[in-house]
Amino acid sequence: MSDTLTRLAAVLEERKNAAPDSSYVASLYHKGLNKILEKVGEESVEAIIAAKDAAASGDCQDLIYETADLWFHSLVMLSALGQHPQAVLDELERRFGLSGHAEKAARQPSA
């Protein structure tokens, strides 16, 4: 895992026990999972809009910025649920060499 993700995961864990007024992440944890999920949704929409704007203008600066926000809030979500970013990287690694169609077909149907 990249050093940046390792360091970020450690900071996210530390902030779980911090006072809500001490940091943005601590305030998100304090507000609960629904607020964190709301932020993930908000950042998803902003990334989509930035992608559409980048396609039209050729300028990807906002797209990179909004994608970083989306990744960050997704990592907060994972951390809130007791998951480490390495689990996502492991899943991506597992998918290497696996056809997207085969991977989708192999998934267990949702109940």
Curated annotation (Swiss-Prot):
It comes from the Bacteria. Pathway: Amino-acid biosynthesis; L-histidine biosynthesis; L-histidine from 5-phospho-alpha-D-ribose 1-diphosphate: step 2/9. It is found in: Cytoplasm. GO terms for molecular function: ATP binding; phosphoribosyl-ATP diphosphatase activity. CDD domains: NTP-PPase_HisIE_like. One of its GO terms (cellular component) is cytoplasm. Its EC number is 3.6.1.31. Keywords: Amino-acid biosynthesis, ATP-binding, Cytoplasm, Histidine biosynthesis, Hydrolase, Nucleotide-binding. Its main location: cytoplasm. It catalyses: 1-(5-phospho-beta-D-ribosyl)-ATP + H2O = 1-(5-phospho-beta-D-ribosyl)-5'-AMP + diphosphate + H(+). GO terms for biological process: L-histidine biosynthetic process. Belongs to the PRA-PH family. HAMAP family: HisE. This is Phosphoribosyl-ATP pyrophosphatase. It comes from Pseudomonas aeruginosa (strain UCBPP-PA14). The lineage of its organism: Bacteria, Pseudomonadati, Pseudomonadota, Gammaproteobacteria, Pseudomonadales.
